[in-house]
Amino acid sequence: MRSETNKERVNNMQKLFLNAQKKQLIKKYNLQQKEDQVNQKVVVKLFNPNGVGTWNLTELNPNTNIAYGLSCLQEKELGYVDLNELTSFKSSLGLGIERDAWFPMNKKTLEDCKQL
């Protein structure tokens, strides 16, 4: 099995976010917001089109590609996710993690997403 090159990883990462979303995620990380975590507005929602898994993200460390948000796998939990791992994931059908194009940026809080 061929490993993913750095160029492929960057291209896959670009597919996860629109430029405006990436800028907003990084801006929120740089602000180091001290507000209640569950009241942070979600910038982007990622999902596994072939099974379980959604990630509602509020901020992104651009140096490490570690994002913060609500992960919904077996349980819903707040925490960090390595986007390099998400971009390298391929399902049994060869599908990768995708961005929910219809999710409204900065409209829902993490608490709203927990209730869904």
Walk through the language-model features, giving the residues of each.
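Catalytic phosphate/metal-binding cores of nucleic-acid and nucleotide-processing enzymes, i.e., regions
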Residues: 2-116
